[in-house]
Amino acid sequence: TRPPEIGGLGFNFKWNMGWMNDTLFYTSLDPYFRSYNHDKLTFSMMYAFSENFVLPISHDEVVHGKGSLLNKMPGDYNQKFAGLRTFMGYMMTHPGKKLLFMGCEFGQFIEWDYHKQLDWMLLDYESHRKTKDYIRALNHYYLAHPALWQVEDNWDGFRWLNADDNTRSVITYYRADEKGKKSLVLCNFAASRWEDYRMGVPEAGTYRVALCSE
């Protein structure tokens, strides 16, 4: 909005509700149906640079019968955690600042209840503890790699490598910093592994896996 001195409200960022609604809808689907809704995963990049956006997973999304972020994920116990990790990898590498409500980072099962504290005892269980460790590693990676946050207002900081692989529910892209240094991202939203998956790269060279949700 405009600065307060000329009558504006002085806000610097806008919540990206379109990204939030589309992404939560997509990730809540059974993986079988995701290929038919692939646009929900990619459409946000049509307007990602039109505003200074925040990607919001706020308290409003984990109360009033909406379910916790972990419980929004379909599948069995292990598939829910895998889905949450993939969701977080996509969120942290998508252009826009991040807002994640407390409890989502370790996979709280129940909705937020302002009458009581979070279910910290869940960290005694391996899946919750490993989820917390993954989110911590993801945060450290994000902080250490300007490609993920330095250029968020134009296409210099983002390029699709393949946005159209709906049959396998995979998207690939890269983020770039002001010096052109890149971080490549592959998100697999299918319920299965893809062996020997081939993806394009922006230039020839040797690439290494820096972080994996598995």
Features from the language model and the residues they span:
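Aromatic-lined glycan-binding groove of carbohydrate-active enzymes
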Residues: 2, 30-70, 94
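Carbohydrate-interacting/catalytic domains
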Residues: 33-36, 65-66, 75-100, 104-214
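Short, charge-rich amphipathic segments
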Residues: 6-28, 57-77, 123-137
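Substrate-binding cleft/loops of secretory-pathway carbohydrate-active enzymes
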Residues: 1-34, 41-48, 109-112
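A generic structural signal for short, non-catalytic loop/turn and secondary-structure boundary residues
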Residues: 4-8, 46-50, 153, 166, ...
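Short secondary-structure boundary/capping segments
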Residues: 2-12, 71-72, 116-119, 200-203
